[in-house]
From Swiss-Prot:
The name this protein goes by in its record: Patr class I histocompatibility antigen, A-2 alpha chain
Positions of region (Alpha-2): 115-206
Cytoplasmic side: 333-365
Transmembrane spans: 309-332
Residues bearing carbohydrate: 110
Signal peptide region: 1-24
Organism: Pan troglodytes (Chimpanzee)
């Protein structure tokens, strides 16, 4: 009988331990890859980031001096040198696959060599509160538009256009969906359980939102009421407005949840109301960190507990340090969040140095 390598055994044991535990709600692991061609300026730039829930834990940038996958969360730093070697090797392999794919896709779309083009990939898995597999994802985009996605059954593909049909036929012939499914239901889940255990103080915490309301006159007849939620984790939150108890969904301006730069999140929802009728409107906040939903109503004497200028300044500073390509990837992720996708990687093997995003022999587009 073959002897199981120590690292693989450790991963399996951590997975078995995780199945004896329960967590609040579901959890996810996601990888986001972005490749941007730079005609006349050398190789495409490749950026890879990994997230567990809403926390970034690894990052690779082909333009960085280190040329290594780097930790972005304290709990991942405990992984040994073999882990980082494998994660780096996988990222570099993906970058080379994307370099070839950028040229192939340019040909599919009959594009010249002069312009810059972008490939974006998202893949990952979700587990339930019992640590068992819920769903997997794989989505690809080209130049900011959907290209091909693994369907919810993890057995078939949806192609967005005629060019993507070519890729679909290639991947079907190579049985790519079966390989992705094996990774998503196996290795992805095992590593996610391990990360949730190792990073439980961060990943399994709940920080309730700090809430307040602001009032912004528009004219003599109208004003904007804005309901703020700040400093919360995890990112999932619900803000709703009601007028005399009736939902005002259609009339609500709602921004996407934004990172605050300190590991927590921010969000606001606003409605335009007739002057003098502010008391008829209530904001309702639901979050995992709250024992029960909060209800806020504008009081003329109420003041924001956190200056709005400070919030805006924080968001501007955050934006200055985020790479444009990663922002594009996250924006595309949110745009595509209602669809199911999948993976670019493989199931657990006997490779003792295996990482959580170990790559397959790549299926090119």
């Amino acid at each position: 009988m073959a002897v199981m390598p120590p690292r693989t055994l450790l991963l399996l044991l951590s997975g078995a331990l995780a199945l004896t535990q329960t967590w609040a709600g579901s959890h996810s692991m996601r990888y986001f890859f972005t490749s941007v061609s730079r005609p006349g300026r050398g190789e495409p730039r490749f950026i890879a980031v990994g997230y567990v829930d809403d926390t970034q834990f690894v990052r690779f940038d082909s333009d960085a001096a280190s040329q290594r996958m780097e930790p972005r969360a304290p709990w991942i730093e405990q992984e040994g040198p073999e882990y980082w070697d494998e994660e780096t090797r996988s990222a570099k392999a993906h970058s080379q696959t994307d370099r070839v794919d950028l040229g192939t896709l340019r040909g599919y779309y009959n594009q010249s060599e002069d312009g810059s083009h972008t490939i974006q990939i998202m893949y990952g898995c979700d587990v339930g509160s019992d640590g068992r597999f819920l769903r997997g994802y794989r989505q690809d985009a080209y130049d900011g538009k959907d290209y091909i996605a693994l369907n919810e059954d993890l057995r078939s593909w949806t192609a967005a256009d005629m060019a993507a049909q070519i890729t679909k036929r290639k991947w079907e012939a190579a049985h790519a969906a079966e390989q992705r499914r094996a990774y998503l239901e196996g290795t992805c889940v095992e590593w996610l359980r391990r990360y949730l255990e190792n990073g439980k103080e961060t990943l399994q915490r709940t920080d309730p939102p700090k809430t307040h309301m602001t009032h912004h006159p528009i004219s003599d007849h109208e004003a904007t009421l804005r309901c703020w939620a700040l400093g919360f984790y995890p990112a999932e939150i619900t803000l709703t407005w009601q007028r005399d108890g009736e939902d005002q969904t259609q009339d609500t301006e709602l921004v996407e949840t934004r990172p605050a730069g300190d590991g927590t999140f921010q969000k606001w929802a606003a409605v335009v109301v007739p002057s003098g009728e502010e008391q008829r409107y209530t904001c309702h906040v639901q979050h995992e960190g709250l024992p029960k939903p909060l209800t806020l109503r504008w009081e003329p004497s109420s003041q924001p507990t956190i200056p709005i200028v400070g919030i805006i300044a924080g968001l501007v500073l955050l934006g200055a340090v985020i790479t444009g390509a990663v922002v594009a990837a996250v924006m595309w992720r949110r745009k595509s969040s209602d669809r199911k996708g999948g993976s670019y990687t493989q199931a657990a093997s006997s490779d003792s140095a295996q990482g959580s995003d170990v790559s397959l022999t790549a299926c090119k587009v």
